[in-house]
């Protein structure tokens, strides 16, 4: 158990997280025991905050993490216990294994003037062949081919554009598609190019915004016809319902059903209504805490109408849909309020990532085709049309942190929207502490200064 000083610190830390999200967040119970967990669906601001706690608070002793630790996260850990031989759905390769074990006993810890210890040059790595390891895993082979550090390995080259890649029947199509994309993105970059070129403005805009979920060359003519009709009608999209319908009409309908990014879900009208709702919250600048409440309310409304309703929850699912071998759905029935809240927290993070990484590119195409009202475009992309707030977001702040600064601390900022630069007053952080702002937002802002 925590002593008095540590308990006070824990109360403050938990209040910060509770206020930012919800009091039912499971991480709070773990934090009380000196444990934090870290995975790709932890909200970014929370993940950065708890990483800092692990570095600075001796009461936080244990970190349970997924392979997100491979993404350059450096923490002052001395021991690592590897319980699984998987990275996502694939087996952990030697290069990923070496990257993973390299996250502990970093040089800045080993050679620290105050706490450094040369014994850390031999990190303690434990591979636990237990219940979490794949049942069909060959443990001896894993030790010899993946975990053995003194064996010589050569990198596996998967990028078809690199010279060392062997081109065969399996990746010939990938090479052609990559070459088509590059040449159409920048004319003349591939010498002797003789494959397809886009012939429409719509096709070019799709290429320039990284759209690769369907064959642009096959469908660009049909897309351009629809775009011409919209332009003849002087269409300027300024609401999320129309936006989602046009994205479906112009792009989504051409995406194969088996697409890996689940964009084909938007062929379903109910899914489009859901993402229209999510985008409305962005336009309305809803906080994370508010979005959690709204998602829970939305699910409860579905449950009241149909007690057997299933909801899409991605990797957290335990129910398969028709024609699928992957569990991506679950039922509200039988779940406690705490379970529903925690499901909402991870799903909001994943839905925001889905919008930013998969959906926004189509918004960009529509904007480049002059089919979006400019202020509405800014609200969809940034959550605001205020130039100063947008400048802060471009400089690395979240919408909530940027909005807080503009609303309460603008005099501590020097913003140049023309050059997209921000200068922070040295007294900003002390003033925010004085005003009792949430330490999660203070930490985020401090890291951007």
Predicted feature locations:
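Conserved nucleotide-binding/hydrolysis micro-motifs of P-loop NTPases
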Residues: 42-43, 69-71, 86-88, 130-135
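Long, charge-rich alpha-helical interaction segments
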Residues: 205-208
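C-terminal accessory/interaction regions of large nucleic acid-associated machines
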Residues: 13-14, 27, 107, 168-203, ...
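A short beta-strand element within the Helicase C-terminal
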Residues: 64-86, 124-126
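Long, hydrophobic alpha-helical segments
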Residues: 119-185
């Amino acid at each position: 158990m925590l002593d008095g000083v540590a308990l006070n610190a824990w109360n403050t830390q938990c209040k910060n997280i509770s206020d930012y999200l919800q009091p039912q967040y499971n991480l709070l119970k773990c934090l009380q025991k000196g444990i934090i967990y870290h995975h790709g669906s932890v909200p970014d601001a929370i993940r950065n905050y708890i990483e800092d706690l692990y570095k600075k608070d001796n009461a936080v002793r244990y970190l349970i993490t997924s392979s997100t630790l491979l993404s350059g996260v450096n923490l002052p850990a001395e021991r690592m216990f590897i319980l699984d031989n998987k990275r996502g759905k694939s087996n952990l390769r030697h290069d990923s294994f070496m990257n993973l074990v390299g996250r502990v006993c970093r040089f800045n810890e080993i050679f620290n003037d105050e706490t450094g210890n040369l014994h850390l040059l031999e990190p303690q790595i434990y591979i636990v062949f237990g219940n979490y390891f794949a049942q069909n895993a060959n443990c001896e082979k894993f030790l010899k081919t993946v975990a053995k550090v003194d064996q010589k390995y050569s990198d596996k080259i998967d990028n078809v554009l690199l010279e060392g890649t062997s081109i065969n029947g399996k990746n010939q199509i990938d090479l052609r598609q990559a070459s088509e994309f590059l040449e159409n993105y920048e004319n003349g970059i591939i010498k002797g190019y003789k494959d397809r070129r886009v012939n429409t403005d719509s096709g070019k805009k799709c290429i320039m915004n990284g759209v690769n979920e369907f064959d642009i060359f096959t469908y660009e003519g049909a897309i351009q016809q629809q775009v011409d009709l919209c332009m003849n009608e002087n269409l300027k999209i300024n609401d999320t319902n129309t936006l989602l319908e046009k994205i479906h009409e112009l792009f989504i309908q051409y995406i194969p059903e088996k697409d890996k990014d689940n964009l084909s879900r938007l062929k379903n009208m109910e899914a489009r209504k859901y993402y229209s709702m999510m985008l409305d919250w962005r336009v309305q600048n809803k906080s994370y805490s508010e979005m959690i409440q709204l998602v829970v309310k939305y699910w409860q409304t579905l449950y009241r109408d149909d007690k057997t309703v299933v909801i899409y929850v991605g990797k957290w699912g335990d129910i398969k849909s028709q024609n699928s071998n992957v569990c991506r759905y679950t039922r509200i029935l039988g779940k406690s309020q705490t379970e529903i809240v925690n499901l909402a927290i991870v799903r909001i993070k994943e839905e925001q990532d889905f919008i930013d990484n998969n959906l926004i590119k189509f918004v960009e195409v529509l904007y480049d085709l002059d089919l979006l009202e400019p202020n509405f475009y800014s609200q969809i992309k940034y959550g605001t049309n205020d130039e100063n707030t947008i400048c802060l977001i471009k400089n690395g702040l979240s919408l909530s942190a940027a909005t807080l600064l503009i609303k309460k601390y603008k005099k501590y900022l020097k913003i140049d929207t023309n050059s997209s630069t921000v200068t922070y007053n040295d007294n900003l952080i002390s003033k925010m502490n004085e005003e009792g702002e949430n330490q999660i937002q203070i930490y985020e802002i401090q890291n951007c200064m």
